Amino acid sequence: MVRRVLAFVDRPCERFEEAAAFWTAVTGTRLSPRRGDDGEFATLLPESGDAWVKIQAVGDGGGAHLDLEVGDVRAAVARAEALGAAVAADHGDWAVLRSREGRAFCLVSGEVPGEVPGEVSVGGTTSARRPPVFAGTRLDQVCLDIAPGAYEEEVAFWAALTGWSPRPGSLPEFTVLAAPGMPVRILLQRLGEGPGRSAHVDLACADPEAARALHERHGAAFVARGRRWIVMRDPAGGIYCLTERDPET
């Protein structure tokens, strides 16, 4: 069973400090102490709620990936393999896998000490508290960019792996996976062309243009305008989107 979904902002090692400064500024968070063998991991810590957004220094490229926090990593790995995933690296209490399309994700066992999520009991069920809206925005979504020929299979894989029911998005090329009490949702996007296997984070914005102005003041750059979103590039070169959605819902 998936207990939490964690969003990782992946940025090149040499741009980590720039990326961390930007993302803490535009989300109203502070950076945790760095951890990992090479100090490659850190968490964006909100004033309240569940710390579910992480940042990772990577060797090249960038983008985003998902970590699924589960109660039993061994059982979760076996289930993922049965659904068609392949293990890329097994570290015992956590593992790196690839989806049927070849998209990397991790299965992990629990929280980092000192970063226990805020939780509330609703009707006897434990659920995570969402971090507060900051400057009219909330980072609440990871978008998986999927090649046209792999789309249906990838949607089925992620729905089965998370146990979340898919529902149509705002446009025909979108499918949403979300669950009550989870601070993050997954958006699966069918690309018009291209290899897929990429991912980026999205922010829900009450006013995307106001959010764009704020982000540009912190060093981001405008890339393109979509039907209901603005594509941006952060100071470390990573792509993300400001989407026209209510950050309170």
Language model: regions and residue ranges:
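Generic marker of residues within folded, mature protein domains
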Residues: L45, V87, G92, P132-F134, ...
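Vicinal oxygen chelate
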Residues: G59-E101, H200-I239, E244
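N-terminal beta-strand motif that seeds the catalytic metal site of vicinal oxygen chelate
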Residues: M1-A20, A64-L66, V108-A156, L161, ...
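Conserved short beta-strand elements that form part of the metal-binding/catalytic scaffold
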Residues: T27-A64, A104-E111, W164-A199, P235, ...
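General N-terminal targeting signals
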Residues: T24-V26, V70, A85, P113-G114, ...
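Core segments of cupin and vicinal oxygen chelate
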Residues: M1-A51, A75-A76, A82, A88, ...
